[in-house]
Amino acid sequence: MKKSTAFTTRLITFTAMMTALVMVSGFIPPLEIPPIGRIYWCDGVIFLGCFLFAPLPSFIIGGMGTFLYDLLLGNTVMMLPSLVIHGLQAFIVSFLLHKVFPKKQEPLFAFSACLVGAAIVIAGYFLTRILVQNRGLDYALIRMPSDVIQEAAGIAAALLICYGLRLKTALTKSGLLPEVSVRKNSWEKQDLSSDKKEEITEENTSDDKNDGKEI
């Protein structure tokens, strides 16, 4: 019971910290690119959370972090879209990385998962500007390059911090990172089970051959 409680407390604490970090990163002065727009930093923090945590905590980090940012900013129109878009982004990226893709060559598969998450964000904000903000198709198309650059910058920053600076490795070795985010995925288990089956069949065939020789 004590181990389970400590694990739950650690997971909740890390999730709350990352959620707050996403919210605070939204208030950091953005990078101004006059022809395109502003590049915010919150996407990099969201992708980093996806690398470190399981799908459900990642959903909370991405969705609630941006939701609280819009709430404090007074942008009530975007609160729900931010929750859905960034929550889905974080959940899908984490799910692909920890549950679908094999653990070998993780940085490469992390990049692939981030591309899917970036597509979700770009499509989500494209539809939001048309359907929720009523800005029209032209405005949505004009803002799309800004979203693409922002997602690219977020992916690059998250990959650099997590794998380039070996943050995930350091947290895992120190025991601070909750185990649910680094457990083996189903592909590895299937590979191990298939290897065991092959070994068993090889042993059986060799036994049959030996029996035949003895006869």
Language model regions located:
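Loop-helix junctions at membrane interfaces
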Residues: 1-215
